[in-house]
């Protein structure tokens, strides 16, 4: 049952975000960001994602910046954090937590994604908006898939079948 839910969530998120990144206005804007070397566009992207998610027929609910209390036994410096998105697919009983990171460089993007993974593991269990696993979405310049797997494998033990890459152009 556990793997079934992971596979179902992966398929749902992959289809949904593939559709998001195929929108012409998103492609054009991301190409402009690349061309002009603009940084700090993560919030813009998250707002676009939320608008998109809320318009999807297969999404029951989607929220951005879901606040959670940190487990003070694990995290001494901060008492509160936010999960970028929680999304509930139609027919599902619980939300899927999602963290989004952007960086032009793949290595920095992966490092920041791992920090979000660690942050999520420091949230008080009672505060988690879901019993489902956290999913990470990273947006960075294109790199070879072997290099991407090397970056991931240095820090996480993750099945590569749950890593999806899509060039945006």
Identify the residue ranges that each predicted region occupies.
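Non-catalytic C-terminal interaction segments of nucleic acid-processing enzymes
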Residues: 2, 153-169
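Surface-exposed cleft-lining segments at the edges of enzyme active sites
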Residues: 30-38, 69-74, 101-108
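A general structural signal for alpha-helical elements within enzymatic catalytic domains
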Residues: 54-58, 125
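Conserved catalytic cores of phosphodiester-cleaving nucleases, focusing on short active-site segments
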Residues: 84-106, 120
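Mg2+/Mn2+-dependent nuclease catalytic core
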Residues: 103-127
């Amino acid at each position: 049952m556990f793997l079934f839910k992971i596979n179902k969530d992966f398929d749902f998120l992959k289809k949904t975000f593939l559709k998001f990144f195929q929108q012409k206005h998103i492609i054009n804007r991301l190409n402009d960001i690349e061309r002009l070397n603009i940084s700090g566009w993560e919030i813009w992207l998250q707002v676009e994602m939320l608008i998109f998610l809320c318009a999807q027929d297969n999404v029951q609910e989607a929220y951005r910046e879901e606040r959670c209390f940190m487990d003070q036994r694990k995290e001494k410096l901060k008492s509160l954090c936010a999960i970028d998105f929680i999304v509930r697919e139609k027919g599902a009983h619980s939300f899927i937590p999602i963290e989004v990171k952007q960086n032009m460089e793949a290595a920095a993007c992966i490092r920041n994604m791992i920090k979000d993974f660690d942050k999520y593991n420091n949230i008080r269990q009672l505060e988690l908006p879901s019993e489902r696993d956290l999913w990470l979405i990273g947006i960075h310049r294109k790199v070879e898939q072997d290099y991407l797997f090397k970056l991931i494998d240095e820090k996480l033990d993750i099945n590569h079948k749950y890593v999806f890459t899509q060039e945006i152009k």
